[in-house]
Amino acid sequence: MCIRDRDHTVPVFLKISPNLGYEQIDDVLDIVSTQKVDGLIATNTTITRDGLSATDHQIKQIGNGGLSGLPLKDRALEVVSYIRSKDQKIPIIGVGGICEPQHAIDMLQAGANLVQVYSGLIYSGPSLVKKINKAILSSSLN
């Protein structure tokens, strides 16, 4: 938090793993409330391979590393919703599995203040951002 001590204009957000359990998320929320963290980014990539259609052999061939994209969506929504149920004020950037406009709306409805896309851009291209913005503007969130 050295940068926060030097310059209070730089927002600091903590990115958390979708692999955390609810007790661990509670611990993170306790720490965030005392350490001048401005918000949370929920979630990072996952190390689990649950719910994939690939065979065990294919998964072993792919190797280790963080999994992102659509397989992360449901857990990311759960984490965002859980955080919002525990803290109504903390800013949350919802990340994970946002591959189409409805996914962004779902993330906002779960309690995120902002959404971040990355894998969705790879599969849908940069027009995804425009589509998300249009969907939000025409939704009940606006």
Q: Which residues does each PLM region occupy?
A:
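Glycine/Thr-rich beta-alpha phosphate-binding loop at enzyme active sites
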Residues: 31-90, 128
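Short, small-residue-biased leader/transition segments that mark boundaries at the very start
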Residues: 1-3
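Glycine-rich phosphate-binding active-site loops on the catalytic face of alpha/beta enzymes
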Residues: 39-47, 97-98, 104-131
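Short beta-strand/loop segments at the ligand-binding rim of alpha/beta enzyme cores
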Residues: 6-18, 83-94
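Extended, intrinsically disordered, low-complexity segments
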Residues: 73, 130, 134-142
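Glycine- and other small-residue-rich loops at beta-strand/loop junctions that grip anionic moieties
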Residues: 17, 68-72, 93-97, 118-121
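Short, catalytically relevant binding-site loops at active-site mouths
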Residues: 18-22, 46-49
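Catalytic cores of alpha/beta
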Residues: 20-34, 85-87, 98-115
